[in-house]
Amino acid sequence: MSPFLQTATDTGWNLSHTYTTLPGVFFAAAKPMVASKPQLVIFNHALAQDLGLALGQASEQELAELFGGKALPPGAQPIAQAYAGHQFGHFTMLGDGRAVLLGEQVTPAGQRFDLQFKGSGQTPFSRRGDGKAALAPMLREYIISEAMFALGIPTTRSLAVVATGEPVYRENVLPGAMLTRVAASHIRVGTFEYAASIGADNRALSAVEGQGGRSPLEALADYTIARHYPEIGPRADRYVAFFDAVAERQARLIARWQCVGFIHGVMNTDNMALAGETIDYGPCAFMDAFNPATVFSSIDQHGRYAFGNQPRIAAWNLARFAETLLSLFADDEQQAIAIGQQALARFNERFNHHYSLGMQAKLGLVNHEEADVGLVTDLLTLMQQHAADYTNTFRRLSGSAAESAENYGTKGNALPGTDALFAAAEFTAWAGRWWARVKQQNISPAEALANMRAVNPAVIPRNHKVEEALAAAVSAGDLSVMGSLLKALKNPFVETEANLAYRSPAPETGEPYRTFCGT
């Protein structure tokens, strides 16, 4: 590798390793594989700058070797993290089976971010897997995670994708790739499930490892509080406050998902990050026609993780998290359970609050009235009845110059997937109620519509457009389609001639769209 890339002072590498101060049961040393023929597919220069990395002068080959495992960044100490998880409701021991954590990049502003290779070969937690990843799922994560970032939704980021030049054997032989993921951390609900499963009272182990007699669970909780919730401090009820803080971030996150029509697809407890970021973009997708029962994942045959179920599943996951903390809530088990139940109930209140605020903002409403809940519910019911496109319905409302219910349906800018709804008599009646409510506010209707355009995206990563980009990149080696898509997704709230092609739902084919985990 070029000496330029190996010099920390020249390139901004500032890797730290606070996670390895935890008991050794939480990780294992792991060496990433070296790509035999690394080729840079895409590199996120803007994110690199945000991380304090000065890699603008590096050649594509140098970047390919760096993010293809040929030579690790200076200061890297790769590990695989141990964790467990409830997958589709069933508990299992897991761990990073195809990923390694290189370290924590500390930015010039003092922020700390995990840098992780994904698809980097076998680790001590691989079980029977090969630890590899195919190119299409890695590019898919890059596209969707960067789209979520542009939408303002907390998310992990993607720094680079490198083609390894090696085959990956799944149902078919696929080209392999490695993704470099950036995250606030990779601590999950499943990490705490793992800690609880190995014994909350295993203090002897922690004492040997310099944890001051704390159990691994206690050490993990203290570490996570210090890293992500330092405002909690050393208060007596710090672990209850910790749960509340995690639940608050999850309530905000899931509410944001619901407001943009995002369907994660595999909300297992190992895919709930305690930093409050969206993580693991396997079978995720965005909804076209509104239907709460929408499922895209090929493995979710019973709709456990359907769009409308996501808030309930988040609460279920948090209940599993609360169970891991019971011994820290109180010494008395019944008291601890009561504390956990009360804390969990607060999540539902928080989610409903943030979701209501988000949906009211989508309708240009700046102050809450009880009747607004019915206004939102009635619109969603009509959207489902008329198979209205979720994104385009709200965008069409945002672009309206309506002044009365009578002419409303003809005033909005026509957008694909909305005509049947806007032509319906029931919608005209609803629109009259909504417009009257908008005009009651202490801001002008024009201001309300401008506010709506700032929260209702014109462009989302439409599933068929993502598939087009992946097919061109993987089958033909043509990255221009993905480049155009990423450019459109970078400014999702702006309507331009260039992004017009990205604002239509997929053509009707009669076949439901299906996503796959990619593992």
Identify the residue ranges that each predicted region occupies.
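Regulatory N- and C-terminal appendages and interdomain linkers associated
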Residues: M1-Y83, F88, F296, Q301-T519
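Short, contiguous strand/loop micro-motifs
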Residues: K31-M33, D130-K132, V240-A241
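Conserved ATP-binding subdomain of kinase catalytic cores across diverse folds
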Residues: K37-L40, H45-L63, G68-P234, L274-E277, ...
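ATP-dependent phospho-/nucleotidyl transfer catalytic cores
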Residues: M138, P167-H264, A275-T381
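Residue-level detector of functional hotspots within protein domains
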Residues: G12, T21, F26-F27, K37-Q39, ...
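Hydrophobic HxD+1 residue recognition
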Residues: V266-M267, M272
